[in-house]
Amino acid sequence: MKKVNIKNTDLEIAPINFGGNVFGWTLDEKESFNILNKFEEGGFNFIDTADTYSWWVNGKGGQSEEIIGKWMKEKKNRQDIVLATKVGSETKEHGFDISKKHILKSIDESLKRLGTDHIDLYYTHFDDKVTSVEETLSAYDEIIKAGKVRYIAASNISPERLIESFEVAEKNNLPKYVALQPHYNLVEREKFETEYASLVEKYGLSAFPYWSLAAGFLTGKYRTEEDFEKTTRGGSIKKYFDDKGKAVLSALDKVSEKHQSQPATVA
């Protein structure tokens, strides 16, 4: 598998990032291990999770990190994995939080659950819109210098706060984000393309879209109203089943048939 570098880092990754929010939610530990084994056997090495996955199950999260940690311990392959996790999301115990206090607490909890001494890529998962950019970046500076994190990245933050982050980092010699994880797929393109794509280019960021399959809609398994009642996620993605969504599915069918592939692969 040909690998590429995440921009402005020495992290080499295969060009598909596995999102681990299903671990401990729709996949139990055994099923998660099977998926991770197949992923690694395919030559892939980039795994993404978050400290709060899946908080909607138990109220606080942590299951995904624990499962990935157990898998790496069993496989003894931590050195082969580029590991990303996140901080800042809400749970039933607290709201969105990227304060220094929360980051310093959360990184240690993530390291313990993952059974590792460092995170390769640490994301601002959500912006709390209260904490100053300088406070957040100074927390990252501290944990990078402590060897707990190698590089930082951003996900659900506004274009304005992303710009401010680079300005503050430059002015105060603080760490800069090296990647952006935007919400982007074939049925939800506009926000990234109009608000973020130019910033990705300006700041030399790598981009790793989440929900690239629109939570499963673009796999093609949802073809009728009844299909949405058959899965845990069906209710939340039924919104895509409109004229636009159906047109995208039709286009995926044509392209996948032409190339003897699957809709999910094309998407």
Residue ranges and their predicted role:
Residues 20-30, 90-104, 126-131:
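Active-site mouth loops of central-metabolism enzymes
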Residues 27-40, 98-114, 162-167:
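Short, acidic/polar
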Residues 6, 18, 32, 47, ...:
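Conserved, mostly hydrophobic/aromatic
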Residues 7-24, 82-95, 118, 123:
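N-terminal small/glycine-rich loop or linker at the start of catalytic domains
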Residues 131-267:
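Beta/alpha (TIM)-barrel catalytic core signal, keyed to glycine-rich beta->alpha loops juxtaposed to Asp/Glu
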Residues 11-16, 43-45, 77-81, 115-120, ...:
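Short, well-ordered coil/turn segments that N-cap beta-strands
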Residues 21-23, 52, 86-90, 124-127, ...:
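Active-site beta-loop-alpha junctions enriched in small/polar residues
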Residues 1-79, 145:
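N-terminal binding-site loop/beta-alpha segment at the start of enzyme catalytic domains
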